[in-house]
Amino acid sequence: IGWCDWSSDVCSSDLAQAHEEFRHAMKFYDFINERGGQAVLAAIEAPPAEWNSPQAVFEGVRDHERKVTRGINELVDLAAAERDHATSAFLQWFVTEQVEEEASAEDLVHKIGMVGQHPHGLYMLDRELGKRKVDGD
């Protein structure tokens, strides 16, 4: 039985999160094309499929959000150096979004740290995550 077969609330939330991330990518795609560029979609490295512990999963999420933030900050710096005000304005939405994403990831690392490997705590955290609301942008 797969994860989505027995945990439909969490799976639904994860799929909604995936759609949100796709919409974020499309913002970049559309912006580049609207500005006369040609956005090219390339393959990205798959995330790890195996983790040593639930703690490691959430730490991986947090580390990934930090990596995304660094990339966005580099783009902001480049736009400023190029005096590209339209791109700077466009990127501010992502700067703000990453503050929220990093805070959320850090909160999850903290919660899983409190729960540890206790099955009841993991179950309750899983239920909480399944009830998350995902922004529609």
How should each PLM-predicted stretch be described?
Residues 119-137:
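Acidic/histidine-enriched, glycine/proline-rich intrinsically disordered or flexible terminal extensions
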Residues 1-10:
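Single conserved hydrophobic/aromatic residue that forms the stacking wall/gate
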Residues 41-43, 76-87, 116-125:
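Long amphipathic alpha-helical coiled-coil segments
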Residues 16, 30, 46-111, 137:
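Acidic/histidine-rich alpha-helical segments that form the ligand environment
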Residues 11-17:
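Loop-to-helix transition at the N-terminal end of transmembrane alpha-helices
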Residues 33-38, 112-120:
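Alpha-helix capping/hinge segments and adjacent helical runs
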